[in-house]
Structure formats: structure tokens, C-alpha cells
Amino acid sequence: MATTPLLLLLLTAVFLSTEITAQRAAPAPGPAGPINITAILEKGGQFVTLIRLLNTTQIGNQINIQINSSSEGMTVLAPTDNAFQNLKPGTLNKLSPDDQVKLILYHVSPKFYTLEDLLSVSNPVRTQASGRDVGGVYGLNFTGQGNQVNVSTGVVETRLSTSLRQERPLAVYVVDMVLLPEEMFGERKISPMAPPPKSKSPDVSDDSESSKKAAAPSESEKSGSGEMNTGLGLGLGLVVLCLKFLL
């Protein structure tokens, strides 16, 4: 009977030592790796075109650097491949490299927003494209209620369908349309290549023609002067004849 408590003590000691050893052997969780926007989009599985544009414009690297160094965070609105396919043919190819950069930056806000934040945010919301053009706002307008949030550019309007990530410092929301800024695609936008409207000026050739017509005597004037000359000649002839008879 005396050996039973001793046996229990030994088993308890063995159990405790095993627990301590296991705790020491368990590796401590390492720090989380840097956030990568491309990796997040690749995991989403329907953003091939957007990833390509992020790489060719180098905006993907800029986002990664700013996300991991800024305290404000960022919000990305990610158009799907279908969204790009629904654009008019040649829309992207017609854009200059600088305009392509502005188009992608227009989908990025330099601040972290939850869906709840976007429902009460002051419009227009600044984007990374804001301030790149003189007088260009490049802002986004958010409206909605409940869990539905809509975004409008002045040219297109769509809703934020799903969230790929909504954790500081980065929020990524899926949109079903490419966000076209009014500064680039609005109806009132004048193409920089369009010639300026010509001011209507008097035609020099018309003036010269009219002056020639004014200077040239009309047919009636010509006939009138001819008749006058004929009358004067007859009168002088009669005077000469009368003088001859008198003399």
C-alpha cells in the first residue's frame, strides 16, 4: 500500500517533465511575412489582367512598399478579368503608358477602409491618381446601405461584390467593372489632339472679288455713258453747220 503513493508521484513527475520538454521544443511562431498584393490577387483566381498591369506599370511594387511602411494603410478595388473584357475593344491599347498608370492608380486609395467606413466616408475619396493632373480630382464616390456598397466614378457605377482581404493595413475589394475616371473618359473631356475650333474670318478672296466688282462699271453705266457721248457729238455738229451758213 505504501508503494502506491510513491508510484503516483513518480508518474506525475514523468508527466510534468514531458510537458516541459514539449513546450521547450515547440518552435515560436515567426513574424508574419510582408504583404504582397500580387499574391493576394493570385489567390483570388480571376485577376490575370490586373496582375499583368500591376507588373508592367510597376504599381504592384509601389503598393507593396507603401503597405509595409505606411501607417495609413491602403484600399484596392480589384476589377475582375470579365470586367476588363467588357470594355470597348482597344480601350486599354489606346491609352498612353502614363494614362495606363493613372487608370490603375485610380483603383487604389492611400488609406485603409472597411466596408463600414466606406458607407460613411466623405465623398469624393482620394485615390493614388489624385493630383497627377492639374485640376484633375480623380476621386471616387461611395454610397450604399447595409452590407452593400456602391462606387461611382461619374462614368460608371458598380458595387463592391466581395472582399479578398479586410485586415489592416490592406483592404482588397472585388469590383465587376473597370473604374473609368471622368477626367479621362467623361463625355465633356476634350482630346488633347483635337484641333482648336477655327474662328470665322472674312475671306480675302471674296473681298478682292467684291472690290473688283465695285470698281468695274456695270453694263447699264456703260450704256448710259455711251448714249451721253453720242448726244453731245450731234449737238456740236449742228452748231458747226449753223456757223457755216451764217458766215
UniProtKB/Swiss-Prot annotation:
Q: Which Pfam families match?
A: Fasciclin
* Signal peptide feature range: 1-25
Where is a lipid covalently linked (GPI-anchor amidated glycine)?
A: 224
Tell me where it resides.
Answer: Cell membrane
Q: Where is this region: Disordered?
A: 189-228
The record's annotation in PROSITE patterns points to: FAS1 (PS50213)
Q: Which residues are glycosylated?
A: 36, 55, 68, 141, 150
Membrane topology type: Lipid-anchor; GPI-anchor
Which keywords annotate this record? Cell membrane, Glycoprotein, GPI-anchor, Lipoprotein, Membrane, Proteoglycan, Signal
Any idea where the FAS1 domain is? 34-179
- Physiological role: May be a cell surface adhesion protein.
Family the entry assigns: Belongs to the fasciclin-like AGP family.
Protein name as it appears in the record: Fasciclin-like arabinogalactan protein 13
Q: What is the lineage of its organism?
A: Eukaryota, Viridiplantae, Streptophyta, Embryophyta, Tracheophyta
